[in-house]
């Protein structure tokens, strides 16, 4: 029969063995499209590529002032208990993107630990799928990122809503 310490230690070990979480920003935590549509005055995705990015670039504080996605504070509160990392792609079309995202993280998540913030090119996200031959978990709204992550051995959660993402995390052992 297991005593209290056996149960306690096995619980600790289970928690320690959970994969590292990586959470995307745009359209998971941050409502990029709502902010972009507002900034360009029409549908960002339907607008000419060069014009839309030129408009975004003119607003130096665009990235740092984006709104939270609905329910994203609840998602962050859950994943942050496990020391979740941020893994977000930056745009090469706007030099304000990286500093703006850093300001958003500092202001909204109070996240300043550079070791937990990874702003990379989209194609580089998959490079974080494994650590020491152990899979990590990516929460991302972009199906291509999830596919690439899984192909590198990671565990991908295609973010469609906060409730489905939280359910997937719970299935993986996050409480």
Where are these regions (language model features)?
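Acidic, Mg2+-coordinating phosphoryl-transfer loop and its flanking beta/alpha structural elements
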Residues: 134-171
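A short, structured active-site edge motif that brings together acidic residues
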Residues: 85-95, 102, 106-127
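Short catalytic/ligand-binding loop motif for oxyanion handling, primarily in non-cytosolic enzymes
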Residues: 29-33, 38, 84-86, 93-97, ...
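Charge-dense, intrinsically disordered terminal/linker segments
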Residues: 1-19, 68, 78, 103, ...
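Short, acidic loop-to-helix structural element flanking the phosphoryl-transfer center
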Residues: 48, 57-86, 94-99
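Conserved Lys-Pro-Asp/Glu-containing loop-to-beta segment of HAD-superfamily phosphomonoesterases
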Residues: 20, 117-144
């Amino acid at each position: 029969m297991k005593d209290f310490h056996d149960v306690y230690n096995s619980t600790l070990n289970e928690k320690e063995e959970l994969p590292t979480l990586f959470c995307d920003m745009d359209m998971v935590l941050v409502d990029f499209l709502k902010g972009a549509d507002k900034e360009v005055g029409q549908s960002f995705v339907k607008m000419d590529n060069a014009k839309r990015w030129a408009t975004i670039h003119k607003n130096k504080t665009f990235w740092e002032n984006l709104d939270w996605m609905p329910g994203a504070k609840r998602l962050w509160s859950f994943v942050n208990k496990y020391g979740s990392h941020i893994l977000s792609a930056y745009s090469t079309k706007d030099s304000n993107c990286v500093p703006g995202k850093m300001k958003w993280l500092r202001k909204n998540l109070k996240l300043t630990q550079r070791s937990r913030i990874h702003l990379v090119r989209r194609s580089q996200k998959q490079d974080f799928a494994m650590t020491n031959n152990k899979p990590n978990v990516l929460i991302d709204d972009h199906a291509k990122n999830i596919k690439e992550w899984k192909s590198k051995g990671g565990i991908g959660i295609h973010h469609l809503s906060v409730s489905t993402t939280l359910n997937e995390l719970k299935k993986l052992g996050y409480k």
